[in-house]
Amino acid sequence: MSELTDLLLQGPRSAPELRQRLAISQATFSRLVAREDRVIRFGKARATRYALLRPYRGIERIPVWRVDDTGKAHKFADIRLCWPQGSCLVTGADGDEQWFDGLPWYLTDLRPQGFLGRAWGRKLAAQLNLTDDIRLWQEEDVLYALTVFNGEYTGGWLVGEGNYQRWITAQHPAEIPLDQKLTHYEQLASDALAGEIVGSSAGGEQPKFTYYAQTPSGNKHVLVKFTVPQQTAVSQRWGDLLIAESIAAQILRDGGIHAIESTVLVTSNRQVFLEAERFDCKGNDGRLPIVSLEAVQSEFISSPGSWPQAMRRLCEQQLVTHQSVAQTEVIWAFGRLIANSDMHAGNLSFYLSEPPFALTPVYDMLPMVYAPNSAGMLRDAAIEVKFDLNVSKSAWLTAIPLAQQFWQTVARDPRISEAFRHIAQEMPEKIRQIEEKVARMGG
């Protein structure tokens, strides 16, 4: 190490700052930089900065590609790890350079998370000498793991040369025939519960896998959530919730709101599968880049809030449209009215493009407040709906009839357990109480 590299351990600095700290001339500074092969220069004119590379396990540069909607992989950028720990310099295919204090915000959704992320973490931990608790992985651990993960990331990202080569040489997947779907799904669910990584790296806590299957509208890439066979009240409740999720998506679509296309399949032993078409896939090989509200707000909003609050702040920066803000208010209000207690920033996403970002179809919209808790306890009565003054009157008025229709449909569905149908019969009265509050709001 030298005095120059010691200074750069804390992060990028300009040439004038470095010369002043080292008390040297421009000529001496140029010679020092030329001798340090780990010192890199980026930026232009007065924005020029110097940084210190921080190779990780011998890797200094990580190439990234992105698959387009036709299935072609295009070079997106090179990522170089730098000091301080976790920082990186991203050089785009067009030569544009950007400094990030952590993972680039548009890649943060690739960090392993949820049910599949934990399976991935356990699988790679021993191989890479990492902790099997993915929450403790550092930024460079994540990037390195992404380069060796032999699977597919959501949104068509390819991190590392190996993944690029695998994509180029991959065979087209064979679809699961409709008449064999349940048999295949039962086996895939068993594999997933045993810790196998089946398909892409989708997040979320509900057990799931991804696959390529025949559907009534053609062959599709699908994300499949599932329950264990319904032998207990807990597994039965999870089955109720997956069926309710499909009902919610259908009602939103019928109401003119873009939501996932989904189908429920039930085996003879009451194992429930919710099959949803992946909205980051187009055709057989095409992919569409997506990014969560969580990732977007981490980059552009200093004080995150609810979906409507975050969307308004993004709209002020012209990152989303007023129409998207209004639609999100309706979605949020509908979620409140159907008792969705899990509307965190990872459950609303956008297609990644030049701003304004367009919303993806609504997903993970279900009455999660009725999910079994960690002790296996179940709610058996309707809860009070939380009123939110951050939602406009017009949004409430749009969402209320949709939510009433949702609960009425759940109450009539013979696939739903008697206990949950009873809750569904009670919920319209709770919504009427919200309707009274909305009536007192100004226009």
UniProtKB/Swiss-Prot annotation:
Keyword Kinase: yes
Broad enzyme group: transferase
GO cellular component, one term: cytosol
UniProt-listed InterPro entries: HipA-like_C (IPR012893), HipA_Ser/Thr_kinase (IPR052028)
GO molecular function: DNA binding; protein serine/threonine kinase activity; toxin activity
Keyword Hydrolase in annotation: no
Pfam families given in the database record: HipA_C
Annotated keywords: DNA-binding, Kinase, Toxin, Transferase
Domain of life (superkingdom): Bacteria
Enzyme Commission identifier(s): 2.-.-.-
Catalytic residues, chain numbering: 342 (proton acceptor)
Family affiliation: Belongs to the HipA Ser/Thr kinase family.
Role of this protein: Toxic when overexpressed in E.coli, leading to long filamentous cells. The toxic effect is neutralized by non-cognate antitoxin HipB. Does not seem to inhibit DNA, RNA or protein synthesis, and unlike paralogous toxin HipA its toxic activity is not counteracted by overexpression of GltX. Binds DNA. Might be a protein kinase.
Protein's recorded name: Toxin YjjJ
Gene name tied to this protein: yjjJ
